[in-house]
Amino acid sequence: MTISKKQSAATETASRVSRRGFLKGASLAGVGGVALGAGMLADINGSRGVKAAEGEPIPIGGGVPLTGWAAADGIEFKRALEMACEEVNAMGGILGRPLAPVFEDTKEQGADNIMPAMQRLIDRHGVHAIVNGYNTGAVTQEYDIIADAGVIYIHHNTDIVHHDTVGKDPERYFSIFMGDPAEYWYGPGLLKFLNDLGEKGQWARPNNKIAIVTGSQNYSVVIANAIRDKAAEYGWEISLYETVVVPISEWGPTLQKIRNDPPAVIAITHWVPQDLAQFCIQFTPNPTNSLVYMQYGPSLAAFREIGKENTNGVLYSTVIASLQDEIGNDFNTRYKAKFGASASPLVAAQVYDSAHYYALAAALAGGTGEPGEFEQNKKVADRLRRMIYRGVMGTTKFFIPEQASIPYPDATKDPSLGMPHQYLQIQDYTTEPALIAPAPYETSQFALPPWYKA
């Protein structure tokens, strides 16, 4: 099934729910139409007479970047898996068997690091499942290692290639799930968000132009192309499509092109925070009357630390982070209490939720399967495919047969059936960004940037 068909099918009318009613019921749990939460595991264990996790340990793997450029995030992935396993074990484990997390370093990532790490987790540690954050550069090359072993693999690589690989051969790749929506959704998601601002009367676009600036990495290019290719459907035109050589600190030539034909929106899909901060520093002394949207980088503290007041007003989004609601904030608080004020629960949330819903699915399936135990792992995979899970990031429900998370509101109008595509704005660089969309999760309202003239 193509993205366009999926989008059309997934966005059929669904009942609207009030913020209060939705959030009140959100922590309930279920399979095949009822939302499941982590606490259901204790009930399952209790119904089986399990009082403690005292059986043979179940090795659960994490292939994470503990060294290299992504080590800061890798540390959070490791902490999250350890924390989730501790909580699962406190509820009796998986039918009385405790989880034992083990790790292999994916270093600088890329296929030459990722594939051996996955192989070691299977061959050396005998893991029953691998629950990762993101690893870049392998582009699904590790999937055959997983498929040959048949173990459950949940990752958060945010990669549309996953849809193609698993969707075309779901029998071979039955055990592989992407726990977040693909990067593609950042494109149509942004266009819908911009139109929603206009429909709500929060912003009146001065024209229909979007200037797109991208780096050369596939992640950035996929998002840029999605914005470009879908723009006309949402009533926009592309005034500039610029690919910059990265890393980049001198934005003068690109800014001149933008100033020569001022757009309503500047969308930068390059993501390195230091580079994006330099754009803000060089943009604000002579700004265009444009909203500025940037990819990923503004979520990192380095962006605000470098750009300071020049970052106020910048928009960004994420398809995967803990929410600022009752459930999300409870996790955020507990995570920082455990690992320190500088820890990042927004990054950790992806592994935390996935480890919990894996444990729940395995318990419902009657237990886990080690490498080579295909029949049992197929039972676990079937439970994952049917599951609707409400965690700290919102709802996880998978596209079938692609086995990738469905985004809300990009592909479904029902917040109980999709992971929220969160839009945030830096309104004061000295504080945390404001969550301004989507409903019913927003905690603040959009504000016009300080450089903008209404």
Name every feature range the model reports, one short phrase each.
Residues 11-13:
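N-terminal intrinsically disordered, low-complexity tails
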